[in-house]
Amino acid sequence: MRVVFFGTPEFALPSLQILLQPQSPFEVVGLVCQPDRPQGRGQKVLPPPTKVLAQAHGIPVWQPVRLRRDPQVLAALEALAADVFVVVAYGQILPLTVLQMPKLGCVNVHGSLLPAYRGAAPIQWAIANGETETGVTTMLMDEGMDTGAILLQAKLPIGPEQTSLELAPQLAQLGAELLVETLLKLEKGELTPIPQDGSRATYAPLLKKQDFHLDWQRPAQALHNQIRAFSPNCFTGIEGQRIKIVRSASPQLHSPPPEIPQGSPGEVVGLARGEGIYVATGEGSLLIRRAQLPGKKEQSAWDLVNGGQLKVGMRFEPLPNS
């Protein structure tokens, strides 16, 4: 089976790797990914991980800025005469001309149980909303945003303290395994695509800065879900400076001892020896385990207590213009 792979970030790597295994029944004849972009603190221009892997296997790579407006890439894709296009976190919408090229269509691996969490950030929003289960879906793509007919699905539990950074590799691997099963069954005509029920659709939009701002008036459980969903980016203010809250403990598993007062939202109301600090919220208290001060490395909240940067009675507050 001749495959063109569309995918850019780490999430796409397991799917590409599984197609490239020795004795694989799949022949990857091309890769399409996003252009090389500046990354990290140093803003060094780096290639996408899928490009590095493809080039190591001698696979031709295309990196159009706008696929639908690049006639040379479109012509090259047509000439490859692929049986199927596989799309995993590519980062651009495929135009109808591309969707219609391969004989078996375009198969997408999406990191949710569609029609739930259509969009760019399904893993993060599933955690932020307190889901206890998610999964991956393979679908036949159409022109909509994650609206294509469902081929196969596989479920995965979400742990009460699991972060999106921990969940993503598990979903990526599960998606790779589901992709192989999907392609083999699709080639044999053993799959019946099931249209999505649009009335049950939910959405997972691109993340924005305001999604990372912690509002201590919210319940402890909601804040915990936000922190682990968007880690390590959530932030708040303390004594006029920004502090990132990187890791918290599940309020269901770590309730404060009875001697710790309730306090007002944002107030540091107690210490958990060797672990961190308890912060009052709009409903209950939240144990903060790891944090990061400006210009410093991430460290345990208990180390910040020992260093005098965090104390009982201090208050986390909104930052101006945050």
Curated annotation (Swiss-Prot):
Keywords per UniProt: Protein biosynthesis, Transferase
Reactions accelerated catalytically: L-methionyl-tRNA(fMet) + (6R)-10-formyltetrahydrofolate = N-formyl-L-methionyl-tRNA(fMet) + (6S)-5,6,7,8-tetrahydrofolate + H(+)
A Pfam family per the record: Formyl_trans_N
GO cellular component, one term: cytosol
Coiled coil, from the record: none
UniProt xrefs under InterPro entries: Fmt (IPR005794), Formyl_trans_C (IPR005793), Formyl_transf_N (IPR002376), Formyl_transf_N_sf (IPR036477), Formyl_transferase-like_C_sf (IPR011034), GART_AS (IPR001555), Met-tRNA-FMT_C (IPR044135), Met-tRNA-FMT_N (IPR041711)
Entry binding sites for (6S)-5,6,7,8-tetrahydrofolate: S112, L113, L114, P115
Domain of life: Bacteria
PROSITE patterns the UniProt entry points to: GART
Keyword Repressor attached: no
E.C. code: 2.1.2.9
Molecular function, one GO term: methionyl-tRNA formyltransferase activity
Function in brief: Attaches a formyl group to the free amino group of methionyl-tRNA(fMet). The formyl group appears to play a dual role in the initiator identity of N-formylmethionyl-tRNA by promoting its recognition by IF2 and preventing the misappropriation of this tRNA by the elongation apparatus.
Record family assignment: Belongs to the Fmt family.
Name the record gives this protein: Methionyl-tRNA formyltransferase
Organism: Synechococcus sp. (strain JA-2-3B'a(2-13))
Gene name in the database record: fmt
